From Swiss-Prot:
GO terms for molecular function: transcription coactivator activity. GO terms for cellular component: CCR4-NOT complex; CCR4-NOT core complex; nucleus; P-body. The keyword Cytoplasm applies. GO terms for biological process: mRNA catabolic process; negative regulation of intracellular estrogen receptor signaling pathway; negative regulation of translation; regulatory ncRNA-mediated gene silencing. Signal peptide: none annotated. Its main location: nucleus. It is found in: Nucleus; Cytoplasm, P-body. The keyword Protein biosynthesis does not apply. Pfam families: Rcd1 (PF04078). Belongs to the CNOT9 family. It comes from Danio rerio (Zebrafish). Homodimer. Component of the CCR4-NOT complex. This is CCR4-NOT transcription complex subunit 9.
Amino acid sequence: MLATGATVSTAGLAQVDREKIYQWINELSSPETRENALLELSKKRESVTDLAPMLWHSCGTIAALLQEIVNIYPSINPPTLTAHQSNRVCNALALLQCVASHVETRSAFLAAHIPLFLYPFLHTVSKTRPFEYLRLTSLGVIGALVKTDEQEVINFLLTTEIIPLCLRIMESGSELSKTVATFILQKILLDDTGLAYICQTYERFSHVAMILGKMVLQLSKEPSARLLKHVVRCYLRLSDNSRAREALRQCLPDQLKDTTFAQVLKDDSTTKRWLAQLVKNLQEGQVTDPRGIPLPTQ
């Protein structure tokens, strides 16, 4: 009897929870009740598997989330964003991330060009905590998109300014923001279209190579195994392109060729393997002249 009662109780609780979800979604439409609804729904986004379709298909909900984003544009420049404003808009961004990563809503999310609403946040440079949290949460939405490995995501992102935005954050952001931005670049590079796009012109490739080189130098002074892993993977993927491979033979940082990172990577067999493969890729196809000088193949 106890077991039966427990089952009924759990089912009843689930129904109550669903009713609360519906109530909070409705409350998003009203400015008076929106802040609490954002907070409660963002807490539930992991446990309610169909929250994304519910948000997308309910009347006025996405418009309300976009209104939350647009409302803080004036606080970006000049940078006056408060912790309270940042927390509130990041709850809205968390719900958009939920929509971005769900298979039923992702295509519509891209078709509506919603990621573009986040780009002004990625342009910010203020180092204060509210801005850092805002940038990191915005990167999380883009990261959720690329994590799906869907071709349509890469095709969409390549029509936008996401690569230069990520490169700027990779150069000057916090370690966590740098890590997510580098992960996004890595995912773009791992797609054949993305690799071809970045290696299409010298300007694009050299910008990426320059920032990665600066990061290696910085990592040699302030090591981060997690960030280094993504940097090495970006380099390895670039070496799959013949033109990029030629250029990398000249500009790959010495720190990736010597023992600078041996201690950082001692327990990371995957990154060590990638690094060894990168060095091997750059050595293959080289011709040595009689004086022992490596010459690039024609």
